[in-house]
């Protein structure tokens, strides 16, 4: 099982907090109820709030973590739609709590299936072919790649080819 923070510092007194020299800043997540994500692709997705840990938003050195940075950046850039892989869904629930705490309008979220290599690992920019030019160099035709990407996680009736 993955590590989950046990919330031991969630309700420290001011005196207890001042005793700690090394500390991080955590977001105090909701514990009761459910959070609901209206995902553009997957529809209504629910999660029990007690499964979302009090997550770190500032490291010991004061630098922000991904969830805080992404939320602030997306808000300041007036992002209306966030499209990302399924593996970031738990981050979305954390970011929604940040948006709600800051009283910001939330963008719309879409989570799409990951693309995997022939070995079953998720495709990464560190893999050999990661740009359109790379695929062109190994002989993948643009229309074939476009058709493949269009059909990932979706199909229309029984069509194997979609003409754009």
Language-model regions: role of each:
Residues 162-164:
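Conserved small/polar residues in nucleotide/adenosyl-binding loops
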Residues 150:
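Substrate/cofactor-recognition hotspot
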Residues 1-125, 131, 156:
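Active-site cores that bind ATP or allylic diphosphates and position pyrophosphate for catalysis
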Residues 133, 138-140:
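Glycine-rich and small/hydrophobic secondary-structure elements
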């Amino acid at each position: 099982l993955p590590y989950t923070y046990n919330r031991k510092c969630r309700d420290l007194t001011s005196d207890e907090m001042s005793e700690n020299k090394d500390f991080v800043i955590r977001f105090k997540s909701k514990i009761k109820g459910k959070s609901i994500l209206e995902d553009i692709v997957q529809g209504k997705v629910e999660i029990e709030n007690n499964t979302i840990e009090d997550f770190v938003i500032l490291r010991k050195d004061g630098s922000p973590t991904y969830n805080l940075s992404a939320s602030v950046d997306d808000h300041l850039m007036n992002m209306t739609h966030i499209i990302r892989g399924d593996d970031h869904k738990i981050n979305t629930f954390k970011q929604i709590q940040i948006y709600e705490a800051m009283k910001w309008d939330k963008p719309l979220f879409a989570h799409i299936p990951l693309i995997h290599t022939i070995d079953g690992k998720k495709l990464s920019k560190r893999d050999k072919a990661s740009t359109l030019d790379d695929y062109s160099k190994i002989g993948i035709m643009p229309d074939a790649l476009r058709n493949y990407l269009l059909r990932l996680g979706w199909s229309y009736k029984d069509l194997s080819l979609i003409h754009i």
